[in-house]
UniProtKB/Swiss-Prot annotation:
This is Putative pre-16S rRNA nuclease. One of its GO terms (cellular component) is cytosol. It comes from Streptococcus pyogenes serotype M49 (strain NZ131). GO terms for biological process: rRNA 5'-end processing. One of its GO terms (molecular function) is nuclease activity.
Length: 139
């Protein structure tokens, strides 16, 4: 059963996919979106859903450190509602506090990647961490 993890931002959506057994997550790509133009990357998501035979989604919820909803939580839930309606697949939500911070730390400490290159992969790695955290907690 393949699960797709998404890190939804205002300009990009980081995408990750689980292995068929649901043990590990791997970052796939970053989809550019434009909220102001109502371009949400659903066409590309549909291609990936078909390619990987996705059966469910996990979307990161950007909560505040005190467990209240951050400013992007509503946007993430709305995005989840759209993909649930479009694909008819279940959508789960995973607390994503500090995943982007953790992803950036990993890129600096383990890969020694420059700031410019980090911006190109950070959302994909954050999606991977969101999905891996979900897999670790649920399987």
């Amino acid at each position: 059963m393949r699960i797709m993890g998404l890190d939804v931002g205002s300009k990009t959506v980081g995408v990750a996919i689980s292995d068929p057994l649901g043990f590990t997550a791997q970052g796939l790509e970053i989809i550019k979106i434009d909220e102001e133009k109502a371009e949400f990357g659903f066409t590309r998501l549909e291609e990936l859903v078909k390619q990987y035979q996705v059966e469910q989604f996990v979307i990161g919820l950007p909560k505040n450190m005190n467990n209240t909803n951050g400013p992007r939580v509503d946007a993430s839930i709305t995005y989840g509602s759209h993909i649930e309606h479009l694909f008819g697949l279940p959508v789960h939500y995973q607390d994503e506090r500090l995943t982007t911070v953790e992803a950036e730390r990993m890129l600096i400490e383990q890969a020694d990647i420059s700031r410019g290159k980090r911006k190109k992969v950070i959302d994909k790695l954050a999606a991977q961490l969101i999905l891996q955290n979900y897999l670790n907690r649920n399987f």
